[in-house]
């Protein structure tokens, strides 16, 4: 090899090294700029620990929106947080005009929601209650799958007591397929499972079906199994002198939402319900009268239908005649089966609606 050839090879190698260094520097600058943009979008209460490249995509570490950024008192330390978010792009979309993201995975996520004494749902107030600014809509983006792993959701209900009742869902794993941004149009398949924490025992929660985040239309099947009635006591017990000592709840709900109107036939089963002692009804111990409502399996079963407007927290509960007789006797005992069905049913509906609004706001709706 002559000297000229060697010189050209050296020049090409040096140029390649310089290009690689320049590309790395440019990419590092772009990642740091992205970190600043994300923090700006989250608002003054938001922060991001780091953004880097990993697992064939972009990794966001330590995303958080503090609770002190909310207008008025917020019942939780954080509005939102995520230990790790991985965004994996579809490289084939680089050659097209539409951006496609293959998957977004959130690990160690957390979201808090508050229902006010007036029944209004609040979540991510730092984002959703921020004054709107005029601006061009974001680019069209298609997301194949959003997945939530080992996350938690806390629902604070100030409409039933003060301080607010806290319901905590842990070990939350969920997936949402087919998401179009920024319009959120089209049906997405939702699959969610989690554990509802209780004072005496933990119950299981399952939610499956289709939802359109833009219109909030949905067809969902909700199942609760072995949920602690002590935790749900504010929904179940109306009389101040009555308390719940033990018991569990199973519930099945098939809900349909069209144009913000909900219709959800369902059934609930109370197993092993035992009220606090020391109170009577018509001269008899309340637990003795409760026993009269139970079947041979120590259960009280109720069929019901929730109907109403999602924008109105007050839902109508319709029951058949036989159920009304049992419910009327329960009302006299200071036990509200209607309140339990309304409270748990509307809480799950509010949570789904709230998460939909959160997704829309976070992704630029």
Map each language-model feature to its residues:
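Elongated, acidic membrane-bridging lipid-handling scaffolds
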Residues: 128-233, 308, 313, 319-320, ...
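Extended terminal
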Residues: 2-12, 210, 223, 242-244, ...
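Secondary-structure transition motifs
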Residues: 61-176, 270-287, 310-324, 357
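Amphipathic hydrophobic-ligand
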Residues: 41-44, 71-89, 101, 128, ...
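Outer-membrane beta-barrel architecture
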Residues: 99-103, 145, 189, 217-219, ...
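Short beta-strand micro-motifs enriched in acidic
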Residues: 88-94, 114, 177-182, 210-212, ...
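N-terminal amphipathic/hydrophobic interface segments
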Residues: 10-72, 108
């Amino acid at each position: 090899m002559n000297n000229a050839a060697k010189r050209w090879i050296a020049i090409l190698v040096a140029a390649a090294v310089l290009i690689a260094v320049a590309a790395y520097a440019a990419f590092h600058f772009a990642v740091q700029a992205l970190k600043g943009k994300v923090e700006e979008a989250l608002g003054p209460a938001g922060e991001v620990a780091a953004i880097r490249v990993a697992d064939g995509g972009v990794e966001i570490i330590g995303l958080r929106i503090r609770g002190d950024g909310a207008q008025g008192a917020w019942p939780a330390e954080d509005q939102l947080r995520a230990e790790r978010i991985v965004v994996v792009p579809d490289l084939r979309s680089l050659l097209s005009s539409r951006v496609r993201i293959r998957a977004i995975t959130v690990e160690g996520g957390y979201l808090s929601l508050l229902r006010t004494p007036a029944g209004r749902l609040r979540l991510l107030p730092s984002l959703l209650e921020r004054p709107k600014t005029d601006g061009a809509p974001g680019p069209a983006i298609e997301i194949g799958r959003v997945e939530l792993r080992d996350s938690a959701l806390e629902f604070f209900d100030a409409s039933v007591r003060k301080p607010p009742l806290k319901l905590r869902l842990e070990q939350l794993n969920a997936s949402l397929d087919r998401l179009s941004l920024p319009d959120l149009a089209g049906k997405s398949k939702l699959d969610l499972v989690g554990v509802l924490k209780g004072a005496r025992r933990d119950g299981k929660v399952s939610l499956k079906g289709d939802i359109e985040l833009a219109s909030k239309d949905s067809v969902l099947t909700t199942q609760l199994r072995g949920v602690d009635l002590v935790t749900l006591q504010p929904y179940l017990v109306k009389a101040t002198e009555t308390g719940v000592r033990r018991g569990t709840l199973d519930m099945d709900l098939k809900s349909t939402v069209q144009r913000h109107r909900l219709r959800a036939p369902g059934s609930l089963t109370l197993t092993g319900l035992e009220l606090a002692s020391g109170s009577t009804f018509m001269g008899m111990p309340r637990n003795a009268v409760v026993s009269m409502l139970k079947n041979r399996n120590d259960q009280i079963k109720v069929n019901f239908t929730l109907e109403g407007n999602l924008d109105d927290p007050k839902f109508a509960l319709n029951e058949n005649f036989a159920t009304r007789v049992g419910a009327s006797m329960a009302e006299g005992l200071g036990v509200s089966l209607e309140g339990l069905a309304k409270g748990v049913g509307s809480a799950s509906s509010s949570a789904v609606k709230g998460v939909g609004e959160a997704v829309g706001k976070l992704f630029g709706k």
